[in-house]
UniProtKB/Swiss-Prot annotation:
The active site is at 25 (schiff-base intermediate with substrate), 58 (proton donor). Heterooctamer of four alpha and four beta subunits. GO terms for cellular component: cytosol. Its main location: cytoplasm. Is synthesized initially as an inactive proenzyme, which is activated by self-cleavage at a specific serine bond to produce a beta-subunit with a hydroxyl group at its C-terminus and an alpha-subunit with a pyruvoyl group at its N-terminus. It catalyses: L-aspartate + H(+) = beta-alanine + CO2. Substrate binds at residues 57, 73-75. The gene is panD. The keyword Lyase applies. This is Aspartate 1-decarboxylase.
Length: 116
């Protein structure tokens, strides 16, 4: 039987911009994408800590080292610059193939979205 598990998480990232007129997605600094084991165009769940909004979108490439976290398109209505968010990816795995000691990649960031 397959189960869905958390694969990676960027925890308490600060939204640096929100662009309503951009084609939908979430722009993320590639340093954070790599650190969390995520991929460009991968589906993500986003949780806005400030307002409780939860939504799904996909990642697009942000400039390395920029700390960029930008809500694009309709997602820009669900958060604003300065909000804290959690970005989560999931994977489906065979339950009997998941190691007992499995640990997803979790990236904690500072107020400038730099990996701690």
């Amino acid at each position: 039987m397959q189960i869905t598990v958390m694969k990676g998480k960027i925890h308490r990232a600060t939204v640096t911009d929100a662009d309503l007129n951009y084609e939908g997605s979430l722009t993320v600094d590639m340093d954070l994408v790599d650190a969390a084991g995520m991929r460009v165009y991968e589906k993500v769940s986003v949780v806005n800590i400030n307002n409780g909004a939860r939504f799904e979108t996909y990642i697009i490439e942000g400039k390395r080292g920029s700390g960029e976290i930008c809500l694009n398109g309709a997602a820009a209505r669900l958060g604003m610059k300065g909000d804290k968010i959690i970005v989560i990816t999931y994977a489906q795995v065979e339950e009997n193939e998941l190691p007992i000691d499995y640990i997803p990649k979790v990236v904690h960031v500072d107020e400038n979205n730099r990996k701690r």
